[in-house]
């Protein structure tokens, strides 16, 4: 019997091992095929880009010739003798060509016409690395020549050393050398290949540089916003550098995060970023911010990079990159007939800030010659005393007295926790949605690790349906109706209120937290999550 059991166990182990190996082999083959398809696709995409470039180039030349024909015809309109030497067919063709003028669709070459002169203008002049694709996160690290000190090596060590072996396989760091002096570029590449040979050979690190023909003439730029000529040139070139880097990185991963060459990072930064993005997978965000400084730590979904690059190309000479990003959000969601607060609420759903910051700026000497910048992110070392969620755009208000600037508005958008002086009966916290929302669940958490006793007590959760008079409700739900039309759907227990919303009450116009009895303690609200129903 023991022998038989042992034989059965051996057979089971063999079958399991065989199936596992078969599955792994099939998975590996599938992965290799996917990588091969991706390479073929990107090669085809590059051939199409070159073909488009040549077509536009020929189109530009033909338009120039047609314009010359039009001028010639205009100049000879009063002279029949000038056209006597042309055949009837030629005259007919000239008439057709000069009378028809097709509409031209603007594209990148409209804003940067110099790119048509060289089909290699959008191809890196230097490209080092394996060309890894299919990762979760692509990190873009632009660097330029600094007269005093370079921080690039320290930055890369900080980014690499805080990755686990598994994380190193799920990302790629693209170093963009924004210089056209090939001697300088090659020196930087040689230095990086020596210092980070393992990372480059494994595909984790890539190094690129743009061709000189990528840049337009930057000598006659209009001075704006009180900036000097040199600063305008610096910020204009910086915009172009960001665009080239983003275009190169777009096809490599799911997300693209913009970094700089003079930063340090926190431990576990990669998993924190990835998990935060996955938590927001069902939300319609455009920018996730992991630092409050400039363009550092701004993450985008790869499909959105096309819009961002196009927008920057349109206005690259006008404003710095962080201002242009804010304008994109304004164009997408702000109503000119509404006030600034309404606009900020709408933008906060597209631009979501993670705290505390994961990246700290350490460079003292700017890439702009002679500029000293003592910029540091004050949120870098702060402990996280609140939780971040994306909530429906809403106007928030409260009767409670706010303590030391810990406002309800900041809490609702995930920037801070709300802290108020002792609540009394009749006090309220109100969330009035900009438009009615179908709500699935809610969560309100009071207190925090530093002040665990500052919780909401004797407080109820109430909702106001949008179609209050037309509701078809069960008797149980009807009994929850209050005199002012709100429905009491929950209450705080041990500082927490959470639950679901009866679907028959949807859509909801407002959420309200109502204090029923005087409290003996102050109140902190450190987490607000009003979860919309998914379609």
UniProtKB/Swiss-Prot annotation:
Task: Give the positions annotated as glycosylation sites.
Answer: 77, 85, 458
- Coiled-coil stretches, from where to where? 28-54
The organism's place on the tree of life at top rank: Eukaryota
Q: In which pathway does it act?
A: Protein modification; protein glycosylation
* Listed GO CC annotations: endoplasmic reticulum; endoplasmic reticulum-Golgi intermediate compartment; extracellular region; Golgi membrane; Golgi stack; peroxisome
Q: What is its EC number?
A: 2.4.1.145
UniProt cofactor(s): a divalent metal cation
Q: Which residues lie on this side of the membrane: Cytoplasmic?
A: 1-6
State the top-level EC class. Answer: transferase
Regulation of activity: Inhibited by UDP.
Keyword tags: Coiled coil, Glycoprotein, Glycosyltransferase, Golgi apparatus, Membrane, Metal-binding, Secreted, Signal-anchor, Transferase, Transmembrane, Transmembrane helix
PTM (free text): N-glycosylated.
Residues annotated as transmembrane: 7-27
Q: Which reaction does it catalyse?
A: N(4)-{beta-D-GlcNAc-(1->2)-alpha-D-Man-(1->3)-[beta-D-GlcNAc-(1->2)-alpha-D-Man-(1->6)]-beta-D-Man-(1->4)-beta-D-GlcNAc-(1->4)-beta-D-GlcNAc}-L-asparaginyl-[protein] + UDP-N-acetyl-alpha-D-glucosamine = N(4)-{beta-D-GlcNAc-(1->2)-[beta-D-GlcNAc-(1->4)]-alpha-D-Man-(1->3)-[beta-D-GlcNAc-(1->2)-alpha-D-Man-(1->6)]-beta-D-Man-(1->4)-beta-D-GlcNAc-(1->4)-beta-D-GlcNAc}-L-asparaginyl-[protein] + UDP + H(+); an N(4)-{beta-D-GlcNAc-(1->2)-alpha-D-Man-(1->3)-[alpha-D-Man-(1->6)]-beta-D-Man-(1->4)-beta-D-GlcNAc-(1->4)-beta-D-GlcNAc}-L-asparaginyl-[protein] + UDP-N-acetyl-alpha-D-glucosamine = an N(4)-{beta-D-GlcNAc-(1->2)-[beta-D-GlcNAc-(1->4)]-alpha-D-Man-(1->3)-[alpha-D-Man-(1->6)]-beta-D-Man-(1->4)-beta-D-GlcNAc-(1->4)-beta-D-GlcNAc}-L-asparaginyl-[protein] + UDP + H(+); an N(4)-{beta-D-GlcNAc-(1->2)-alpha-D-Man-(1->3)-[beta-D-GlcNAc-(1->2)-[beta-D-GlcNAc-(1->6)]-alpha-D-Man-(1->6)]-beta-D-Man-(1->4)-beta-D-GlcNAc-(1->4)-beta-D-GlcNAc}-L-asparaginyl-[protein] + UDP-N-acetyl-alpha-D-glucosamine = an N(4)-{beta-D-GlcNAc-(1->2)-[beta-D-GlcNAc-(1->4)]-alpha-D-Man-(1->3)-[beta-D-GlcNAc-(1->2)-[beta-D-GlcNAc-(1->6)]-alpha-D-Man-(1->6)]-beta-D-Man-(1->4)-beta-D-GlcNAc-(1->4)-beta-D-GlcNAc}-L-asparaginyl-[protein] + UDP + H(+); an N(4)-{beta-D-GlcNAc-(1->2)-alpha-D-Man-(1->3)-[beta-D-GlcNAc-(1->2)-alpha-D-Man-(1->6)]-beta-D-Man-(1->4)-beta-D-GlcNAc-(1->4)-[alpha-L-Fuc-(1->6)]-beta-D-GlcNAc}-L-asparaginyl-[protein] + UDP-N-acetyl-alpha-D-glucosamine = N(4)-{beta-D-GlcNAc-(1->2)-[beta-D-GlcNAc-(1->4)]-alpha-D-Man-(1->3)-[beta-D-GlcNAc-(1->2)-alpha-D-Man-(1->6)]-beta-D-Man-(1->4)-beta-D-GlcNAc-(1->4)-[alpha-L-Fuc-(1->6)]-beta-D-GlcNAc}-asparaginyl-[protein] + UDP + H(+)
Does this UniProt record's set of keywords contain Plastid?
no
Q: Name one Pfam family in it.
A: MGAT4_cons
Write down the InterPro entries for this protein, in alphabetical order: Glyco_transf_54, MGAT4_A/B/C_C
Topology in the lipid bilayer = Single-pass type II membrane protein
Key word Iron-sulfur present in the record?
no
**Single Gene Ontology MF annotation:** alpha-1,3-mannosylglycoprotein 4-beta-N-acetylglucosaminyltransferase activity
Topology feature Lumenal, residues = 28-535
Annotated GO biological process: glyoxylate metabolic process; N-glycan processing; protein N-linked glycosylation
**Protein family per UniProt:** Belongs to the glycosyltransferase 54 family.
Which purpose does this protein serve, as stated in its record? Glycosyltransferase that catalyze the transfer of GlcNAc from UDP-GlcNAc to the GlcNAcbeta1-2Manalpha1-3 arm of the core structure of N-linked glycans through a beta1-4 linkage and participates in the production of tri- and tetra-antennary N-linked sugar chains. Involved in glucose transport by mediating SLC2A2/GLUT2 glycosylation, thereby controlling cell-surface expression of SLC2A2 in pancreatic beta cells.
- By its UniProt entry, which PANTHER family does this protein fall under? ALPHA-1,3-MANNOSYL-GLYCOPROTEIN 4-BETA-N-ACETYLGLUCOSAMINYLTRANSFERASE A, N-ACETYLGLUCOSAMINYLTRANSFERASE VI
The molecule here is called Alpha-1,3-mannosyl-glycoprotein 4-beta-N-acetylglucosaminyltransferase A
Give the encoding gene's name: MGAT4A
